[in-house]
Amino acid sequence: VTAVGSFGYFISPIFTNYSLIEYGWNYTLFLFSLFLVTGLIAAFFVRSPKDNEIIENRSDQSLKEALSEALESKSYILLISGFFVCGFHITLVGTHVPKYVMDRGLEDWTAAAILALIGLFNIFGSLLSGYLSTKISKKFLLSVIYLLRGFSIAFFIFTPPSVLSAFIFGASFGFLWLSTVPATSGIVAHLFGTKFLGLLYGIVFLSHQIGSFFG
């Protein structure tokens, strides 16, 4: 699901840059509104499995007990903290890189290309992360992803500005963009089961969005 969503992120910067230049922001916003309506219509056709017991733990644990167990877990708190940093990274790059690129003397299309590359390579990064999550330690995988993100950002900041370095950054950071999601959700499911996975992962994702706000 994450990989497919990234395809939209790949198309969006290219389409937006072209539409803003050719038709202006009014028409561009109208088209994005149509895309949003299409997504809302599709959501009405999503159906839950007929037998929820297939995907839930057979447990009599209450919601209060699940929350208490999670919030007392050091691993869960660290996961929340890590996803805060993830959200900070995501918005920092998505919001400030376009202006940063132009401030360093590159043309504005370079920023759109970076964002498009992020979306494109995130398709492969998310798929690989999901696969590796079933083969190696999810905690180790998540640590490596965050470490490589730091290297990718440092490379972009400290290397001389060029189209090549911008493209390398877009591809490398895109590969790591949302590759944290499969490992993170997998860790939550491994620690606490799937009965309250939606809520417990939702809390982790809330931390991600708070990090995005500060980014």
Language-model regions, residue ranges each:
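Cytoplasmic helix-loop-helix junction between adjacent transmembrane helices
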Residues: V1-V4, I187, G193
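Flexible cytoplasmic inter-helical loops of multi-pass small-molecule transporters
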Residues: R47-E65
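Transmembrane alpha-helical cores of Major Facilitator Superfamily
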Residues: A3-F7, F84, A116-L120, L147, ...
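C-terminal transmembrane helical hairpin of 12-TM major facilitator-type secondary transporters
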Residues: A116-N122, L128, S133-I187
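Extracytoplasmic gate region of multi-pass secondary transporters
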Residues: P13, L71-Y131, G215
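A late C-terminal transmembrane helix in Major Facilitator Superfamily
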Residues: Y9, L178, L191-G215
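Helix-loop-helix hairpin linking two adjacent transmembrane segments in secondary transporters
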Residues: V4-D51
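Small-residue-rich segments within alpha-helical transmembrane domains of MFS-like 12-TM solute carriers
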Residues: F10, G87, T91, G174-P182, ...
